[in-house]
């Protein structure tokens, strides 16, 4: 790979392009100030305005969410893995069909591997703008977001409708669902009952890794944060490691696998 090719695969923080209309809750008060970034792959954005920095997907997608204080991301579920690394700020993650099954607060450097198939949301509870990096499993990130019914209802009250084609339509700007395209069906009460309940006692020890614990495990070798034999034992189609000074040799090497470095 030449230098030109490599430069095309570098995304710098200062060049990130946010989308403020990425999801169905973009007009809902309390969620209307968040920013979505798609860095590698299109992720699960529902907006035609979303800028994708690197379109190639190596079996997973990488993005980010940026939010000011007291801004939240509404309850939703995914069909593949969703992992967050807190880049900046203080964040509360909550889960459950109504968001009240449990919660945990994460600080800078912490990692959370949210169990696939449960509803989750998160909010910035810090005092400044914060950002969390996200890794979504699969080339298509599982085919889109599954929203809790109340999120769809709240969005409709504020002019946004999600079509069954996965696209957003802003009725306050005169947009309508295209002919032959219906609204995204809401989950029924019976379907909602099929989602598992996970207590904080089950969640936190198995799906949260704290920064200083990760740093300690990176002494002399990369910390295996998410792997079959990692701190968070899982095989979601990618591995997550943390490197620090002395974790790896400075010798050149090659690998047959895709490798993404976040500095």
Regions found by a protein language model. Name each.
Residues 97-116:
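Short acidic-glycine-tyrosine-enriched beta hairpin
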Residues 59, 64-69, 77-97, 135-137, ...:
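Short, conserved beta-strand element in jelly-roll/cupin
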Residues 1-58, 164-252:
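A short, N-terminal "cap"/entry segment at the start of jelly-roll beta-barrel domains
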């Amino acid at each position: 790979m030449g230098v030109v090719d490599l430069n095309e695969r570098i995304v710098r923080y200062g060049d990130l392009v946010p989308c403020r209309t990425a999801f169905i809750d973009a007009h809902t008060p309390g969620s209307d100030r968040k920013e979505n970034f798609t860095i590698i792959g299109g992720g699960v954005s529902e907006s035609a305005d979303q800028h994708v920095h690197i379109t190639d997907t190596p079996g997973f997608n990488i993005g980010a969410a940026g939010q000011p204080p007291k801004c939240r991301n509404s309850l939703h579920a995914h069909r593949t893995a969703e992992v967050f690394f807190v880049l900046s700020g203080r964040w509360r993650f909550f889960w459950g069909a109504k968001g009240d099954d449990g919660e945990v607060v994460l600080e800078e450097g912490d990692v959370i591997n949210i169990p696939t198939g449960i509803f989750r949301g998160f909010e910035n509870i810090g005092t400044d703008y914060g950002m969390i990096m996200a890794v979504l499993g699969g080339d298509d990130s599982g085919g889109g977001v599954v929203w809790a019914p109340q999120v769809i209802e709240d969005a409709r009250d504020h002019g946004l409708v999600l079509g069954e084609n996965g696209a957003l339509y802003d009725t306050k700007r005169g947009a309508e669902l295209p002919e032959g395209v219906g609204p995204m069906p809401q989950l029924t009460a019976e379907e909602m009952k099929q989602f598992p309940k996970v207590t904080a006692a089950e969640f936190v020890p198995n799906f949260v890794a704290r920064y200083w614990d990760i740093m300690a495990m990176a002494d002399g070798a990369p910390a295996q944060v998410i792997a079959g034999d990692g701190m968070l034992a899982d095989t979601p189609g990618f591995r997550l490691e943390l490197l620090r000074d002395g974790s790896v040799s400075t010798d050149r090497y090659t690998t047959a696998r895709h490798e993404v470095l976040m500095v």
